[in-house]
Amino acid sequence: MQVGLQCAPLLTGIKVSNLLGVDRQHRDTVIRLFCTTGISCRLLCECSERVTFFLFRREKLEEYLMCPEVMALMKAFGYSGVGLVDILSKVAERYSGYMKCREPFPHEIGLLLGYPVADVAGFIQNGGKDFIYSGYWKVYENLEERLEIFEEYDQAKEQVVRMIAAGADVHKILKFHRTPSRKHQIAV
């Protein structure tokens, strides 16, 4: 149920990636769960009691990272001309440092999660303040469009919860949503 609640938009194919935090005892279970799916699993941080995974659809994430606006902001974060594996290694290092109170929060995670560039940049420029709405992320412009995306995420969560209540597991949910028809897979 926890995977379904935290990752419904990813599982239904309308989001490019998701963070998943679980108790450390479930680490290997999560890895096994996603090893035979179209969703890649990267351990971001392993603390004493919790682990954080970055789950993603590789092709869609690579496509998103090639958008000129995304590339420009990633370059500002110090990622220039590097591939996804290198990006994820560096993000994991920065995120782990943040979780251990050694480094500032790596805002590039917002881009890797498919958040709109304007909202990631707005968050940084405004220090997380002066947003026009707070939902799945803090919104700094295009509120109507973002509300539509949030509504789709809410609907995905409701649908996944219903499927789990009816006995579906992650594999059945992924199979059911194999060909997403949503318009907001990636918000630039």
How should these model regions be labeled?
Residues D28-I87:
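A glycine-rich, hydrophobic loop/mini-helix early in the fold
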Residues S48-R50, I124-E141:
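Short linear loop/turn motifs
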